Amino acid sequence: DNIVTVSSKEQVQQENAQKPESAGESVYTDVTEATETPKTYESVTPPATGISEEENLAGDGDIHKVYLTFEDGPSDHTGEILDILAQYDVKATFFVVGKEDEESQALYQRIADEGHTLGMHSYSNKYSQIYQSDEAFEEDFERLRDELYQVTGVNSIYYRFPGGSSNQISNVPMSDFIHYLNEQGVIYYDWNVSAGDAASNAYSSEEIVANVMDDVVKYKTSVVLLHDASDKSATVEALAPLIEALNEMGAEILPIDEDTSVIQYVKADSID
């Protein structure tokens, strides 16, 4: 496995500035308990060797590997996205948040059943709660991991930090949380291509496609930031033409797995 350290933090800073924490809350403030037999989770050691962003730049003849990643769901748009992915026989990655309603839990199951990668994006998706302390982060993480296991039987080993691993929102050093995930055998993913659909003045579907295509041509491995929250109808509209454009350029569209080069703003192996 390879870790790609993204040297430029402009994208994550833009993401933090544009993405509201949740309705009525500032981004800067930011289940039922398990009663079953305690579970044993498979541990996967995070990759220890990294490649630079420069080494990830695509050259002539390189095949572009593109990983479509959706975060903030499930929502009423997630099913539509799954339908489109199925239509094109494309697998993606979903970094989900915690929800207890039957519809959302059915979507967790559908994501797993249809061969997509089920990742974690925190239970509450509220910065003020998640990043309040080491204990708060760990409690939030374990709550989501346990729920996904109980609902789907999947031991998720992939995580995306709300705001990314280099966010400036947390009052606790991000290295604390990275160290914890390393201990848990969990690999976290940032992104190196952004669709721009987190912005409050969201782009049109055509602009979303253009944003992605302008950047994926640069890299051997592109982890694309997309959102499947309830207000992201333009993302749904953009998905089919985006897949068609990626297919036309000869890209491989893949779900994150153990063979994926890891895109991280802060490398996991840089934390003791």
Predicted region positions:
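Catalytic domains of cell-wall/extracellular-matrix polysaccharide-remodeling enzymes
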Residues: 125-225, 229-247, 251-252, 258-259, ...
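Polar/charged alpha-helical tracts
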Residues: 10-18, 83, 106, 113, ...
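N-terminal, intrinsically disordered, polar/charged segments of Gram-positive cell-envelope systems
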Residues: 1-63
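Active-site beta->alpha N-cap acidic-glycine motif
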Residues: 40-156, 245, 261
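Short linear motifs in intrinsically disordered/low-complexity regions
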Residues: 2-3, 17, 31, 248, ...
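Context-gated lysine
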Residues: 9, 19, 39, 65, ...
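N-terminal start-of-chain detector that recognizes signal peptides
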Residues: 38-42, 65, 90-91, 161, ...
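Compositionally biased, intrinsically disordered low-complexity regions enriched in proline and serine
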Residues: 14-15, 29, 42, 89, ...
